[in-house]
């Protein structure tokens, strides 16, 4: 089943944790869940150019804390923090509570599966040859320390009449090993011939301790792929 299931979902509670971290009673759960969906939709729409990999939402008492993981934090913050203030107002309208937005910089976007997938999708939309885009992403990831990477592209590749799937892999990507730190990302390229799907599996090594927060700690300690950039109260 490791070949079929989402690698992140398979490892939740082992070495990965949820992107929405809060508890609610029966009466509030659906409302808060819809709020999370709307928050992510608004932020992803506003931050198209910011290379956002993930959005983590936490809800301490009567507050909403949103952490935006971005490869371009300057685009999120804006001039003198103007853009981040606008985002806070929009999120506050949805949640009707105090909002705190943290920006976390991704220092190595080549080692983030979501950003790699989006980069390839953007290249396909610009009519870059799909094999060249895939090989370039594989080489960049391996050069920066990935232990393995696999990329799948499917659809009318190169404008072909018949849709097909092509993939590249380098190194090892152990999908059945639960202690393996396997990142997974998907993206869709909207080309003139139709849509093309891009999937990326990226193996960064093994996490030996049983800690769902292990990956987040590695990211925030500065030795990983990202570091905290700003806390906008």
Curated annotation (Swiss-Prot):
Query: Quick one: a GO biological-process term for this protein?
Result: translation
- Name any GO cellular component annotation: cytosolic small ribosomal subunit
* InterPro entries named among the record's database cross-references: KH_dom, KH_dom-like_a/b, KH_dom_type_2, KH_sf_prok-type, Ribosomal_S3_C_sf, Ribosomal_uS3_bac-typ, Ribosomal_uS3_C, Ribosomal_uS3_CS
SMART domains reported in the protein's UniProt record: KH (SM00322)
Q: Does the keyword RNA-binding apply?
A: yes
Q: Provide the alphabetized UniProt keywords.
A: Ribonucleoprotein, Ribosomal protein, RNA-binding, rRNA-binding
- Which terms in the Gene Ontology molecular function aspect does this entry carry? mRNA binding; rRNA binding; structural constituent of ribosome
One matching Pfam family is KH_2
Map out region (Disordered) in residue numbers: 214-233
Q: Where is the KH type-2 domain?
A: 39-107
Q: Which NCBIfam families match?
A: rpsC_bact
- Protein function: Binds the lower part of the 30S subunit head. Binds mRNA in the 70S ribosome, positioning it for translation.
Q: What's the family?
A: Belongs to the universal ribosomal protein uS3 family.
How this chain assembles, per its entry, is:
Part of the 30S ribosomal subunit. Forms a tight complex with proteins S10 and S14.
Q: What is this protein called?
A: Small ribosomal subunit protein uS3
The encoding gene? rpsC
């Amino acid at each position: 089943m490791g070949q079929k299931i989402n690698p992140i979902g398979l490892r939740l509670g082992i070495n990965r944790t949820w992107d929405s971290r809060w508890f609610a009673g029966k009466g509030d759960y659906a409302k808060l869940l819809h709020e999370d969906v709307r928050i992510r939709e608004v932020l992803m729409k506003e931050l198209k150019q910011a290379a956002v990999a993930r959005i983590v939402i936490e809800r301490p008492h009567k507050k909403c804390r949103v952490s935006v993981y971005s490869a371009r934090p300057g685009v999120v913050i804006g001039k003198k923090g103007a853009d981040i203030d606008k985002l806070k107002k929009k999120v506050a309208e949805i949640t009707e509570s105090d909002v705190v937005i943290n920006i976390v910089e991704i220092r190595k976007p080549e080692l983030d599966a979501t950003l790699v997938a989006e980069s390839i999708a953007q290249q396909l939309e610009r009519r870059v040859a799909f094999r060249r885009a895939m090989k370039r992403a594989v080489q960049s990831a391996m050069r920066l320390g990935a232990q393995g990477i696999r990329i799948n592209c499917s659809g009318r590749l190169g404008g072909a009449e018949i849709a097909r799937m092509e993939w590249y892999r380098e190194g090892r990507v152990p999908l059945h090993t639960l202690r393996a730190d396997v990142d997974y990302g998907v993206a869709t390229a909207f080309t003139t011939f139709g849509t093309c799907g891009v999937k990326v599996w990226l193996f960064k090594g093994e996490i030996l301790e049983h800690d769902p927060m292990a990956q987040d700690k590695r990211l925030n300690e500065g030795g990983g792929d990202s570091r905290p950039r700003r806390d906008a109260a």
